[in-house]
Amino acid sequence: MSTPLLVLIAVGVALVWGVHGWWMSRRLQSARRDPLTGLWTREAFTRRARRLLRNPHAVVVLADVDRFKQVNDTHGHAAGDALLATTAARLAHAVGRTGVVGRLGGDEFAAVLIDREGTAADRFAVLARILARPVDAAPEVHTTVSLGWVRRGDHPAEDLSGLLRRADGAMYAAKRGPGRVRRAGLGRLLANIGGRRPGRRGAA
């Protein structure tokens, strides 16, 4: 077999494997993304969030759409999907490229961001107002999003699951008070003494 032919065969095999590798990479990437919102899935979010938590300035925030079932029942699932997609986009924009946002399931989202300036409280207050704006694709939908957050530095011994539990307790308290934003306390969470709410699970 001539040398030019061998070269052509080698190039062809390399191209086939290159295309196959690209295709597999795209398949894996899509499997890690939530199909509705484009955010990371729970598993993909967990891996990235754990890396960010090595930074003592990390902040964990949990977001939950208020009255989501009522939105679905009143306006239909298309409006509910539009609300979730818009909420996800607004969260991702607020967190930026240096953080990570994921959809944990249903109408619940989580994010980890780095807050070196100590402005998380102000940022989340603004974010809550942004999340309460009407949805362009479904302007008849009006609701709010409750946020609970916790600083990594306040609980250095906690892993991601523990921090999510604290953020969840704060978020549940936010649903019952004004402003729709609560920071997890430094001690035992009064709003959630028994841990996460029934049916809620922390990241593995």
Please report, for each region that a protein language model flagged, where it lies by residue.
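Signal-transducing coiled-coil linker helices
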Residues: 1-35, 42-53, 57
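GGDEF/GGEEF active-site signature
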Residues: 88-152
